Amino acid sequence: SVSGLVGGDAQRMWDYAAEQETLCGPYLQEVIATALCVAESNACMHRIVAAPTAGACGVLPAVLVPLYRRGAVDEEAIVRALYVAAGIGAVVGYRASISGASGGCQAEVGTAAAMAAGALVDLRGGGPEQIGHAVAMALKNLMGLVCDPVAGLVEVPCVKRNVIGAVNAVSAADMALAGIESRVPVDQVIDCMGDVGRRLPVELRETALGGLAATPFGQSVKAKREERRSQEQEL
């Protein structure tokens, strides 16, 4: 990656799973590895699909690709699930925000998790109400998550937050399919997320002025990056 802080973790996850049984089981292991892989690809400036943003690009493919690879679903089902996910993202974008700069990471990874949760419910034959409950639970689980990229790069903690978003989506989908409901209606959850995002201080909305970006580690990475830029300009 640009800073050298990101890269190789997806392969480490695959290697770990090949050597021993993971705590989370085969499917979730693939979800984790795929989320890392796609998010690392973004950090390394490779081609990705923003879903709904580049910073959250690993969540949706992380839950869908393993199912397709296993032959659990066909291409037509995946396409339908992607339409469901897109519809969810459009609603969240209209009622709240999908931008970390305006709503924090809850608006990016949180929305991606909601999209993925809804897509999974659709793949398993769930109806609109269950999709709504999955979306609500996925959003509630990440409510208030701040956007605090170290040195302003979409690397730390962004890559690993894609993993949390994907695993969150799986748990929300399974709960909804089990008949577990969100007590707060999904539209109200979305509106609440938008309100929370607007209340976040500017330091916690992609400015790299607060949160993990403001830690001694974060500041050291920023200083090294600025020093490197200065040296490049002198050349």
What are these regions (language model features)?
Residues S1-V49:
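Extended amphipathic alpha-helical scaffolds
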Residues G25-N42, A77-A96, N141-P149:
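Acidic-glycine-rich active-site phosphate/pyrophosphate-binding loop
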Residues A56-L64, A112-G118, A166-A172:
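Well-ordered alpha-helical segments within folded domains of soluble proteins
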Residues G93, I98-Q106, A112-A113, A117, ...:
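N-terminal glycine-/lysine-enriched basic segments
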Residues G118-L235:
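Functionally critical mobile loop/hinge segments
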